[in-house]
Amino acid sequence: MSFFFIRKIFGSTNKKIIKSFRKIVQQINALETEMQSLSDEELAGKTEEFKQELKNGKTLNDLLVPAFAVVREASRRFLNMRHFDVQLIGGMVLHNGMISEMKTGEGKTLVATLAAYLNSLEGKGVHVVTVNDYLAKRDTEWMSKLYNSLGVSVAFITNNLTDEERKEAYSADIVYSTNNELAFDYLRDNMKFSQEDMVQRGFHYGIVDEVDSILIDEARTPLIISGPVEENNQIYKHINKIVTKLVDSDYEVDEKGRTVFLTEDGISRVEELLRSYNLIPENSSLYDTDSMIMTHYIDQALRAYKLFTADKDYIVKDGKVVIIDEFTGRMMEGRRYSDGLHQALEAKENLEIQHENQTLASVTFQNYFRMYNKLSGMTGTAATEAEEFRDIYRLNVVKIPTNVPVKRVDIDDEIYGTEKEKFNAVLKFIEECYKRLQPVLVGTVSIENSEKLSALLQSHSLKHSVLNARYHEQEAYIIAQAGVPGSITIATNMAGRGTDIQLGGNAEMIAKVELKKIKNADEREKKYQEIVERVKKDKEIAIKAGGLCVVGTERHESRRIDDQLRGRSGRQGDPGLSKFFLSLEDDLMRIFGSDRMRSFLQKVGLKNNEAIHHPWINKALEKAQKKVEARNYDVRKSLLKFDDVINNQRKVIFKQRNNILGNEINDLLEVYSEVNESVVEGIIQSGYYEDYIENIVKEFHTRYGITLDKEDLAKFLNKQEALNYINDKIQEFFTEKEKYFNSQHTTDLWNTIVKQMMIMTLDHLWREHLSVLESLRQSISLRAMGQKDPLNEFKREAFLMFESMLEKWKELTIHRLAHFKLADNQEIGNRLHSARNSRLPKVSRNDKCPCNSGKKYKHCHGAVTVVS
């Protein structure tokens, strides 16, 4: 039963959707005995049976009940896990193209198998999207037993695969991959010179795990494949020295708006310093036409110092500035801030300054995932962003009931006057938990705070584990053991971690580590059973101690991130506890706290080392968070409107590329005709064409090296007759050229050259166009001062520029083809190879590929073969 039918008849309330799906669950349960009676071969044979029924006219909805029953039985046999009724409901939500909100520990990985299997029957591919390579690999290996038992192929894609391996993986029925890999493969495919080199096969159905993290938190970050632009990097070092000499009165910081402004005193001081470095003329001001570029460098340097903090927004690793994801605390290696900000940070940290990049291709997750014919998602926290999911992605959120009621207790926040007092209170609270062997998970918002708290625990001899961007490699194991009695785990933003915290520890993860060195099979089995028993006893101890205790050391801007941290505790009916410790020095309190809240706290009077508990404070904080979320949503919505303009143009360009790669070049005559008419129109802007015959002859000789006969042109009575004559001459010229090339080399050499020339010219102009559009987008807001709508102005100008670019592409392609000279095979091959690779920066074959794939250049774009 589809969601749209439900909404039409009953309305789209969560309760009614769940009620309707429970009826379908009863039908699935009724088939359980029948499925259990089937042999393994008969169960596997159901897949081909379903595919045949689809060919005979049935729909996926018709097959949902038996298909889900088959998956549940296969899971019971081969994974020793039986889908709960609520998991079946979650699978139906996914199949109907909605978001399934399921609490932590409710088995989202298993839920995905239901919708993935059902939709794979169409043979068009299913993408299951995870937040990191570890989860993609883990889930594939874990669920492959189920899929393979039913004759369904499954594969995963990580950043170290070659193009050949990627293409093979994408051909599987079900593919697990990260959002980054999928989107970058899409961009890389649309930079290829042959359809055979492309790895993806379309966007049929996608299931996005941690959907809020990917489609909301990362929505503003475009994925960019870029190449370096040559420029003088010394200027960043000079500007860095200038900014370090400024005092507080020289600038104003707006932390809410994430901007820094120079004051009048600051402008004067900067101008004086710029002159001392000979960066602007002696009598020039900062805002003179010739000097205004310096404001860009100054602005970025000020942002680097006043808005970006080491170990919070970025870390320095191996001599490079590595961005930290503000929502997940993960390092985003390979990504760089644009517009000179990354160079400003490198200058600030006294590192080697890398060249600023030029965008070769880009796409946002918003626009990438909207290409799927059907999209669905899973997360533990989506309800707070339900409006955005509905408006942007047309995805409705359905809250799935838990299999067992949640027993976790959420205690009111405690607020302290200073950060030091807050951390002392956290220390005392952790010590109390430690004494009763209650496992503790502490969430921090930055690496700096996690290491500060770690040092405090060390000074009190409290053994603990730290999980932040610095220790990403050990992430899964650390989190898996966070439920061991007496364990203390510190983690930056728990969003998207993806690994379940089980009370007593994760027996499988422990076994993987402890059994590594044991070769004897009997000894391994004995040791494994010991681990299982140990974990079982530890679970009982942890439960008696109160279950997992989650401690938040600061409220995040987003309620979802706080809820995700809380949600680590109380899985599958386990007991648990959560509590947040705050201070007036926290960012959220300092920047977004209301005047009313500050007034209230002042009246109450905070004494040293004393905390305030009050339900009103929790409500006030939630109100502040809602304001921030609403503002961030407005920003994302506005950015999407602008990006939609670029995205529509991107679709046209990529479609044009694929058309060129996929077809023989039979329509060149039409291109010639359009270009020729454009040339003649450009010459004859008014009056009779015969007055311009001299200019027409001269122009076509310059463009094509073709001599048109003046006397022949003079015979024609109007422009159209002349155009027909010119078109015939141009066609004759290129036909002769094609015959000659093919006779001297391979029979399809000319066709290959035409395709390459059209694509290389298009790619070059598209890159330039993207750069111009970005500049236009950054400056367009000023139009509002002239009572004009910036978005409408952007649409209008972007369209005109796009039309102009396409005309230029046609003209430039014909011009280059006309002047293309015949050379020996080797020279032609080298020329095509050189032109093809001019789009990417020069790198050695063992360096990382500049397309951000993470692979060596020789295994990525350096491995692409050229026509010889």
Swiss-Prot record:
Database matches in InterPro entries: Helicase_ATP-bd, P-loop_NTPase, SEC_C_motif, SecA, SecA_CS, SecA_DEAD, SecA_motor_DEAD, SecA_preprotein_X-link_dom
Main location: membrane
Enzyme Commission designation: 7.4.2.8
Reaction catalysed by this enzyme: ATP + H2O + cellular proteinSide 1 = ADP + phosphate + cellular proteinSide 2
Cofactor(s) of this protein: Zn(2+)
MF GO annotations: ATP binding; metal ion binding; protein-exporting ATPase activity
Binding site for Zn(2+): 849, 851, 860-861
Any one Gene Ontology BP term: protein transport by the Sec complex
CDD domains with a match to the protein in the record: DEXDc_SecA, SF2_C_secA
TM annotation in the entry: none
Cofactor binding summary note: May bind 1 zinc ion per subunit.
Membrane protein topology class: Peripheral membrane protein
One GO CC term on file: cytosol
Signal peptide extent: none
Cellular localization per UniProt: Cell membrane; Cytoplasm
A Pfam family annotated for this UniProt entry: SEC-C
Main function: Part of the Sec protein translocase complex. Interacts with the SecYEG preprotein conducting channel. Has a central role in coupling the hydrolysis of ATP to the transfer of proteins into and across the cell membrane, serving both as a receptor for the preprotein-SecB complex and as an ATP-driven molecular motor driving the stepwise translocation of polypeptide chains across the membrane.
Assembly, per entry: Monomer and homodimer. Part of the essential Sec protein translocation apparatus which comprises SecA, SecYEG and auxiliary proteins SecDF-YajC and YidC.
Family stated for the protein in its record: Belongs to the SecA family.
Database matches in PANTHER family: CHLOROPLAST PROTEIN-TRANSPORTING ATPASE, SECA INNER MEMBRANE COMPONENT OF SEC PROTEIN SECRETION SYSTEM
Name of the protein described by the UniProt record: Protein translocase subunit SecA
Species annotation: Wolbachia pipientis wMel
